Amino acid sequence: MNSDPAPAITGPPAVRVPGRRMEELSPDEALRLLGTVELGRIVFTRHALPAVRPVNHLLDAGDIVIRVQDGSTLAALLAALPGTGVVVAYEADAIDQGAHLGWSVVATGYATAITAPGEIERYAHLLQPWVEGTTSGAIRIRPDLVTGFRLLESRR
């Protein structure tokens, strides 16, 4: 039996980055910021693994609406669970690549297919697809949990 103490686990030295701090956003402010950008990422489960797709969106009465391509993985997932929906996360951000300042928001909730003809037509006019392919459907994400943070310059 070896009674020597186990060696301490060490890693790279701690790094302190001056000049920036993170501030948590309220859910209302996070949703407001989400409404100021057009592009985000939807995260859903595919074959028990996370799948991420860039999509454009709009914010409508607190819901996130995206268009979905016919025959896409996400469209098939929602078609398999009509009315029930699937749990998704939606992330959008605006972070300056040089200054590393900005914000990021994640909304988690259930996504359901929009089926009312009037709504589908309305969103078809408001939210234009930006990739090739047939896009006739739309999805509504009702956020249950909204989190976000802002990257700011440090207080001096």
Residue ranges and their predicted role:
Residues V37-D70:
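Short beta-strand segments
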